[in-house]
C-alpha cells in the first residue's frame, strides 16, 4: 500500500511540476504580449499636447489604438485559480471519531507504531494538538507555529530515546496560558518513503479547535486528501455535526475507514457484508450526502473515475486509499489543465481571427482607396457633363416654362393675397413702401415657380447618379474613416458637397446669388417704369401688369448660364478638396497598414506558434492524466515527419492509430502545435479522420528526445493501397466525391490542406474516404508562403509563396487523374523527371498528366479545369461536387446497363 501511495503522490508532483512550468511560461507569454502592445501603441491623446491632427494623423494614431492585441490577456480569475493550484502541495489529513482512532490510522499508514493508541481519560478531556509528519533524514520532534517558526520548548521526547511519541508532547497542557503554545503543531520529521512524497497531518481534538477551521487553514497551502477514521458501528450526533459542517463549507470527498479494534485479527473476506446487509454507518453517510445509494460504495472505485467519497469497512482494503488519493489528485490536475487549455485555445482563436482581419485589411484597404478615387472621378466628370450639357436644355426649358406658365403665373399674381400689406377695398392708392413690398412678393412668386422647375430638372440627374453608384462609394469612405473621430470625417463631407451642389443651387438661387441680384435690378427698373408721381392703386390689372413686366424682362440664356456656372464652381471646389483629403487619408492608412503588416507577421511567426505549443502541452497533460500513456503496437508505416503505430485501446477508442512525431527543431514544434490546434478545433466530420488526443512522451527513445504522440482513428487502408488492390469505378468516383466533401469542409472552416494526395486519403472497410494528415493544414491568414506539399500534387503558384485554397483544387485534379486511371502509376510527364527540382521546373512550365485512353471526356475536362495554371480559372469545389455526382450517375448507371466505353473498372 505504501508503495502505491508513494507512486501516486510522486506522479502527482511530477505532473504538477509540468503544469507549474506551463503556467509560468503562459504568464510570461501574456507579459510579453502586454509589453509588445504597450510598445506598439501610441501614447494616449490626453498625455500629449494639442498638436494639429488631420485624417492621416488620426488613422496612424488610432489604427492600432483599438489594440488588436489588447484583448489578449490572462483572465485574472483563471490566473488566480491556477496559481493557487500549482502553489498547493498535497497532504493526507486524518480526521476521526476520536483521537485514539486517528492515531491508529496514522500508525497503519506509516506501518510503524509512532503514536500511542491507548489513552487514559475520556474524549471530552482530550487535548491532542495538531500533528504534522514530514520527511527528514533523522527522526526529530519539535513544536512550531504552522507555516511560521519553531518554538523553543523542551519536550519529553528530547529527554531520551523513544519509539512512540510521549503522550505529554502530543497534548496541550491545561495550565498553559501561552496562546502560541496552544496553537502550535507538533512537527515530526521521519525518514520514511511515504513522507518523502507527501506530508501527513493529524487534526487536533475537536474540543481544542473545530475541524472546519483546521481544514480552512490547510486549503490555502495544501490539497488535502481527507481520511476519516471510524471505530464505532455508527456515527454519534457530534460526528454527524462535524461532517455536516465539512460538507457545508468544502467540496472535498472523504475516505471513511473503519479501523480494526486493537488486538483483533484482520477481517476475513468471507465475513464481508453483502449489499443487502448495508451497515448503519453506510446508511448514515448516505443521509449526510457523502455516499450514493445507487451503488454499493465499498472502497473499490474505478481508477479513472472522478473522486467520490468512499466507505471502507474491511481493514484489508486500506490499500484502496491509493486509488482514492489518485482520484482526488487527478481530478485537481485535470480541472487545472482543462482551465489552462481553455485560456490557451480562446486566445489562439482570437489570434487566428485577428490574423484573418489583418490580412483582409491589408488586402482590401488599398483596393478601397483606389475604388474611392476612381468612383469619385467618375462622379465628378458625370456632374460636370450635366452642368455643361444642361445649359442649353435649361435655357430652352426656361423659355418653354415661361410660355406654358405665363397665363397661369399672371392669374396667380392677379389673385395672390399680399402678406403684411393692407390693401384698401375701395381701390384707394397706397404708399411707396407698400407698393415695393407688393412688387417684391409678385417677383418672389414668379422666381420660386421658375426655380422649382429648373432645380427639379438638375436634381433628377444627380439623383440618378446617387442611385447608380454613390451608395457604394459612401460605404467605402465610411469603412476607410471608421477608425477616425466622427468630427474629422472630412473626405465624406466633401463627397456630400459634390452630391449636394445641385441642391445648393436651389437654396442660394433666391437668397443672395448673383442671379437673384440681377433679377432684383430688373424688378427695380419695372418699379421705376410703372411708378407715377402719385402711388397707384393695387388692383387686379395692376398686379397682372407688374407680373407681365417681370416675366418679359427675364433673360433665359443668362439665367441658365448663371445656374450652370454656379453649379460648376461648387463642383470644382468640392472635387479638389475631396482629392486633397483622400490623399491625406491614404497617407494615414499607409502608415497604419505598415504597422498592421508587422503585427500580422508577429502573430503568424511568433505569438500564435508560441501559444499553440503551450496549448499542446496543457492538452496533452490533460489527456495523459485521463487516459494514461498509450501503448505502441506494431508499426503501420513511416512518413517524412513520424512513424505510425497500431494502438489497440486508448481513451475508450479502439482500435487507434498512433502517430509518433519527434520535432527536430523549434519551427517543427510550432508547426505541429498549430496543426494540433486546428485539428482539435475542427468539428467532427465524417470525411475527416478523427483526432482522439495527444500525449507528450518526455522519455521517448530512452529519454534522448521528446515525442508527441497523436492518437487518431484507425482506418482500413489508404487510397494508394486501395488503387493497387483494385477498386470498381463506382467506388473510385464515390471516393472522389468524399474527398471533395472533406476539402470543402476544411475550406468552410478557413483552412487549406496543402497536401492532398493518395497517401493522405484513408479508406474504411466500406471504401468510404476520409482525409488525414493535416500537417501542412493552415488557415489562409496564417500561411507564410512556405513551399510545402508533395511535388506531384503541388500547384505552380506554391513556388511563388503567394497562394490560396485553390491549391487544394489543383491537388484534387491530380488525385482525380489517379482515381480515373485506376492505378498508382506515375503520369509520363512526371515519371521522366530525375529529381524534385526537375519536376518542379516542369510543373511551373506547364507540365501536366497526359490523357489516358480510358478517360471519359467530362472527367478529362474536369481534371484540366482543376489543374489550370491560373488559380482564378480553377472551378470552385461547390461546382466540382455536383459535376462529379453527375458523372457518377451517368457512368455508373450506363455501366450497370452496358459495358462502359469511357472508364474501365480496375478490378
Swiss-Prot record:
Subcellular location, record wording: Cytoplasm; Cell membrane; Apical cell membrane; Basolateral cell membrane
EC code(s) of this entry: 2.7.12.1
Pfam families: Pkinase
Catalytic site: 755
Acyltransferase keyword on record: no
SMART domains xref list: S_TKc (SM00220)
Residue stretches in coiled coil: 373-409
Superkingdom per UniProt: Eukaryota
GO terms of molecular function: ATP binding; protein serine kinase activity; protein serine/threonine kinase activity; protein serine/threonine/tyrosine kinase activity; protein tyrosine kinase activity
Binding sites annotated in the UniProt record for ATP: 636-644, 659
GO biological process: cellular response to fibroblast growth factor stimulus; negative regulation of apoptotic process; positive regulation of ERK1 and ERK2 cascade; positive regulation of fibroblast growth factor receptor signaling pathway; positive regulation of kinase activity
Domain Protein kinase per the UniProt entry, residue ranges: 630-884
Catalysed reactions, semicolon-separated: L-seryl-[protein] + ATP = O-phospho-L-seryl-[protein] + ADP + H(+); L-threonyl-[protein] + ATP = O-phospho-L-threonyl-[protein] + ADP + H(+); L-tyrosyl-[protein] + ATP = O-phospho-L-tyrosyl-[protein] + ADP + H(+)
Entry keyword set: ATP-binding, Cell junction, Cell membrane, Coiled coil, Cytoplasm, Kinase, Membrane, Nucleotide-binding, Serine/threonine-protein kinase, Transferase, Tyrosine-protein kinase
Alphabetized InterPro entries for the sequence: Dual_SerThr-Tyr_Kinase (IPR051302), Kinase-like_dom_sf (IPR011009), Prot_kinase_dom (IPR000719), Protein_kinase_ATP_BS (IPR017441), Ser/Thr_kinase_AS (IPR008271)
Family: Belongs to the protein kinase superfamily. Ser/Thr protein kinase family.
Role of this protein: Acts as a positive regulator of ERK phosphorylation downstream of fibroblast growth factor-receptor activation. Involved in the regulation of both caspase-dependent apoptosis and caspase-independent cell death. In the skin, it plays a predominant role in suppressing caspase-dependent apoptosis in response to UV stress in a range of dermal cell types.
Protein name from the UniProt record: Dual serine/threonine and tyrosine protein kinase
Organism: Macaca mulatta (Rhesus macaque)
Amino acid at each position: 500500500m505504501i508503495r502505491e501511495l508513494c507512486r501516486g503522490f510522486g506522479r502527482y508532483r511530477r505532473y504538477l511540476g509540468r503544469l507549474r512550468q506551463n503556467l509560468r511560461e503562459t504568464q510570461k507569454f501574456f507579459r510579453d504580449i502586454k509589453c509588445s502592445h504597450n510598445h506598439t501603441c501610441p501614447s494616449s491623446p490626453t498625455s500629449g499636447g494639442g498638436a494639429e491632427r488631420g485624417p492621416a494623423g488620426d488613422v496612424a494614431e488610432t489604427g492600432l489604438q483599438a489594440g488588436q492585441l489588447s484583448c489578449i490577456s490572462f483572465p485574472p480569475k483563471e490566473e488566480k485559480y491556477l496559481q493557487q493550484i500549482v502553489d498547493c502541495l498535497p497532504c493526507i489529513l486524518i480526521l476521526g471519531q476520536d483521537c485514539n482512532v486517528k492515531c491508529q490510522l496514522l500508525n497503519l499508514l506509516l506501518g510503524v507504531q509512532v503514536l500511542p493508541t491507548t489513552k487514559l481519560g475520556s474524549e471530552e478531556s482530550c487535548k491532542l494538538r495538531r500533528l504534522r509528519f514530514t520527511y527528514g533524514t533523522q527522526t526529530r520532534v519539535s513544536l512550531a507555529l504552522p507555516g511560521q517558526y519553531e518554538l523553543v520548548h523542551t519536550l519529553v521526547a528530547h529527554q531520551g530515546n523513544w519509539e512512540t511519541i510521549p503522550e505529554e508532547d502530543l497534548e496541550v497542557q491545561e495550565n498553559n496560558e501561552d496562546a502560541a503554545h496552544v496553537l502550535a503543531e507538533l512537527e515530526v520529521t521521519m525518514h520514511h518513503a511515504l513522507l518523502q512524497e507527501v506530508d501527513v497531518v493529524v487534526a487536533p481534538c475537536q474540543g481544542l479547535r473545530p475541524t472546519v477551521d483546521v481544514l480552512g487553514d490547510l486549503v490555502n497551502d495544501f490539497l488535502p486528501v481527507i481520511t476519516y477514521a471510524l471505530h464505532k458501528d455508527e456515527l454519534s450526533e457530534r460526528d454527524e455535526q462535524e461532517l455536516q459542517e465539512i460538507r457545508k463549507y468544502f467540496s472535498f470527498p472523504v475516505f471513511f475507514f473503519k479501523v480494526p479494534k486493537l488486538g483483533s485479527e484482520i477481517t476475513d473476506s468471507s465475513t464481508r457484508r453483502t449489499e443487502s446487509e448495508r451497515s448503519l454507518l453506510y446508511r448514515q453517510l448516505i443521509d449526510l450526502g457523502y455516499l450514493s445509494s445507487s451503488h454499493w460504495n465499498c472502497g473499490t472505485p474505478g481508477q479513472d473515475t472522478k473522486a467520490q467519497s468512499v466507505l471502507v469497512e474491511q481493514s484489508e482494503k486500506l490499500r484502496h486509499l491509493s486509488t482514492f488519493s489518485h482520484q482526488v489528485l487527478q481530478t485537481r490536475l485535470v480541472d487545472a489543465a482543462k482551465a489552462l487549455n481553455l485560456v490557451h485555445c480562446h486566445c489562439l482563436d482570437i489570434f487566428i481571427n485577428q490574423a484573418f482581419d489583418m490580412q483582409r485589411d491589408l488586402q482590401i484597404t488599398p483596393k478601397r482607396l483606389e475604388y474611392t478615387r476612381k468612383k469619385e472621378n467618375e462622379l465628378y466628370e458625370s456632374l460636370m457633363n450635366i452642368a455643361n450639357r444642361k445649359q442649353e436644355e435649361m435655357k430652352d426649358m426656361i423659355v418653354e416654362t415661361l410660355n406654358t406658365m405665363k397665363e397661369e403665373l399672371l392669374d396667380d399674381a392677379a389673385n395672390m393675397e399680399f402678406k403684411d400689406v393692407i390693401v384698401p377695398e375701395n381701390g384707394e392708392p397706397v404708399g411707396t413702401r407698400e407698393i415695393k413690398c407688393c412688387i417684391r412678393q409678385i417677383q418672389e412668386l414668379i422666381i420660386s415657380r421658375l426655380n422649382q422647375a429648373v432645380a427639379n430638372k438638375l436634381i433628377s440627374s444627380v439623383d440618378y447618379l446617387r442611385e447608380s453608384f454613390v451608395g457604394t462609394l459612401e460605404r467605402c469612405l465610411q469603412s476607410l474613416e471608421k477608425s477616425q473621430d466622427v468630427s474629422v470625417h472630412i473626405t465624406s463631407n466633401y463627397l456630400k458637397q459634390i452630391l449636394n451642389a445641385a441642391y445648393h443651387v436651389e437654396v442660394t438661387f433666391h437668397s443672395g446669388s448673383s442671379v437673384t441680384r440681377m433679377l432684383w435690378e430688373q424688378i427695380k427698373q419695372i418699379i421705376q417704369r410703372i411708378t407715377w408721381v402719385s402711388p397707384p392703386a393695387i388692383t387686379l390689372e395692376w398686379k397682372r401688369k407688374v407680373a407681365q413686366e417681370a416675366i418679359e424682362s427675364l433673360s433665359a440664356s443668362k439665367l441658365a448660364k448663371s445656374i450652370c456656372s454656379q453649379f460648376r464652381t461648387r463642383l470644382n471646389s468640392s472635387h479638389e478638396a475631396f482629392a486633397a483629403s483622400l490623399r491625406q487619408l491614404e497617407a494615414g492608412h499607409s502608415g497604419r497598414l505598415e504597422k498592421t503588416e508587422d503585427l500580422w507577421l508577429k502573430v503568424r511567426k511568433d505569438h500564435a506558434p508560441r501559444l499553440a505549443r503551450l496549448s499542446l502541452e496543457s492538452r496533452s497533460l490533460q489527456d495523459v492524466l485521463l487516459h494514461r500513456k498509450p501503448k505502441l503496437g506494431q508499426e503501420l508505416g513511416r512518413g517524412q515527419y513520424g512513424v505510425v503505430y497500431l494502438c489497440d485501446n486508448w481513451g475508450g477508442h479502439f482500435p487507434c492509430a498512433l502517430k509518433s512525431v519527434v520535432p527536430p527543431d523549434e519551427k517543427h514544434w510550432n508547426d505541429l502545435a498549430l496543426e494540433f490546434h486546428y485539428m482539435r478545433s475542427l468539428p467532427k466530420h465524417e470525411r475527416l479522420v478523427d483526432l482522439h488526443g495527444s500525449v507528450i512522451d518526455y522519455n521517448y527513445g530512452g529519454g534522448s528526445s521528446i515525442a508527441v504522440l497523436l492518437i487518431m482513428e484507425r482506418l482500413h487502408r489508404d487510397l494508394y493501397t486501395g488503387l493497387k488492390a483494385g477498386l470498381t469505378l463506382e467506388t473510385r468516383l464515390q471516393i472522389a466525391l468524399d474527398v471533395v466533401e472533406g476539402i470543402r469542409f476544411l475550406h468552410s472552416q478557413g483552412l487549406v490542406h496543402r497536401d492532398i494526395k493518395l497517401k493522405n486519403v484513408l479508406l474504411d472497410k466500406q471504401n468510404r474516404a476520409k482525409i488525414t494528415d493535416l500537417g501542412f493544414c493552415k488557415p489562409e491568414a496564417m500561411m507564410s508562403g512556405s513551399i510545402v506539399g508533395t511535388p506531384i500534387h503541388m500547384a505552380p503558384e506554391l513556388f511563388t509563396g503567394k497562394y490560396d485554397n485553390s491549391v487544394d483544387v489543383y491537388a484534387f485534379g491530380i488525385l482525380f487523374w489517379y482515381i480515373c486511371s485506376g492505378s498508382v502509376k506515375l503520369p509520363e510527364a512526371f515519371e521522366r523527371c530525375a529529381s524534385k527540382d526537375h519536376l518542379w521546373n516542369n510543373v511551373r512550365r506547364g507540365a501536366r498528366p497526359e490523357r489516358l485512353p480510358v478517360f471519359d471526356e467530362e472527367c478529362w475536362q474536369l481534371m484540366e479545369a482543376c489543374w489550370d495554371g491560373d488559380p482564378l480559372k480553377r472551378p470552385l469545389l461547390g461546382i466540382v461536387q455536383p459535376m462529379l455526382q453527375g458523372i457518377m450517375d451517368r457512368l455508373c448507371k450506363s455501366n450497370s446497363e452496358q459495358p462502359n466505353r469511357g472508364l474501365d473498372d480496375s478490378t
